Regions:
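Active-site-adjacent beta->alpha loops and helix N-cap segments on the catalytic face
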Residues: 66-76, 122-135
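Distinct, well-ordered alpha-helical segments
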Residues: 69-73, 98-107, 153-159
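Functional cores that coordinate and move charged inorganic groups
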Residues: 121, 129-164
Length: 171
């Protein structure tokens, strides 16, 4: 830019006519490790993220086994760190193994686990979700919810989303 002072020995890149953006964050990513590496794995996901300008990704837990434990989450994060192309946060399932009801594992998650989600499976039990929100508030967890009613979405997706939005607003 005008009046730019460049320290001796530093390079200057001419970015005239270009758009320069900071690194991006993908809050909803699927690397499919463990269990579905034939779809995507940590190495290919990391390479794709870095090539697209993403330096941080938030990984969904719809893996096999489902990422319901800190051990699985930490293993995925450690492998991403070893590869070293971008930072990765592995989310943990809201309900154990996506069973729609068991949430006791949330009570013992370590502090470095910050996000919980059922990914594409909304929790259909309002009482379970009320308890989840209470635990999340107490433990400092962020709930990423696919808020849709699966019984309605096959025939009216917008209505399915609206019902869940109203439900979540009243909790």
């Amino acid at each position: 830019g005008q009046g730019l002072v460049v320290p001796e020995g530093e390079d200057v890149l001419d970015a005239k006519g270009r758009t320069i953006l900071p690194a991006f964050i993908d809050t909803h990513c699927h690397w499919r490790t463990p269990g579905f590496e034939y779809k995507e794995d940590i190495a290919t996901g990391s390479a794709a993220a870095a090539a697209g300008g993403y330096t941080f990704v938030n990984l969904m837990p719809n893996t096999k086994p489902v990422c319901s434990t800190p051990e699985i989450a930490h293993a995925v994060e450690a492998e991403a760190k070893r590869i070293g192309l971008c930072d990765a946060n592995q989310t943990v399932s809201i309900t154990r193994d996506f069973d729609g009801k068991t949430i006791d594992h949330l009570l013992t998650l370590p502090e470095d686990i910050k996000f919980i989600t059922e990914d594409g499976n909304g929790v259909m039990n309002n009482a379970v979700m009320a308890r989840v929100f209470a635990i999340a508030t107490e433990r400092g967890l962020t709930v990423m919810s696919h808020a849709e009613d699966r019984e309605i979405s096959p025939w009216d997706y917008r209505l399915a989303e609206n019902i869940e939005t109203v439900r979540n607003c009243h909790l």
